[in-house]
Amino acid sequence: MLKSVTDIKRGMFWRLLVGTLVWVIAQLLGAYGYMSVTLGFLVGIVGWLYIIGELYMGDAGRSNASCNNESVQMAFFANRLIITIGFSIYHIGYFNEHLAGGANINSLNIIYNLADILNKIIFGMIIYSAALQDTKKRDSTNEV
């Protein structure tokens, strides 16, 4: 999203990918018993917090702040909230399933399905909306 309208540092993608892999792999290893579920949870939280730090205070946040495209800034802000709030649902589900004494499988399915709706469908709709807004602005300036 930012790459399309501003110059970003090359390592940003890799840092976000590493944070994501740390989060997902740690919690997967904890869930499958290859490491302590508590350690998997904590390391996963560290990976997620690293992603959030990159989005708020790292190169991604700085690139967005210097971007002059309102549509991209709106989409970045909304998606950053989704990553902050929406991704926490996965941690809540992991905690409920593995650390809080277990949870009803139907409740977990509802939790994870709501997280997927928020984190995948709405995420994509925000990007689509920003692209439409940007296209409309570009078309209106070309007509003048």
Report the location of each language-model feature:
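Polytopic alpha-helical membrane-helix bundles and their juxtamembrane interface segments
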Residues: 1-144
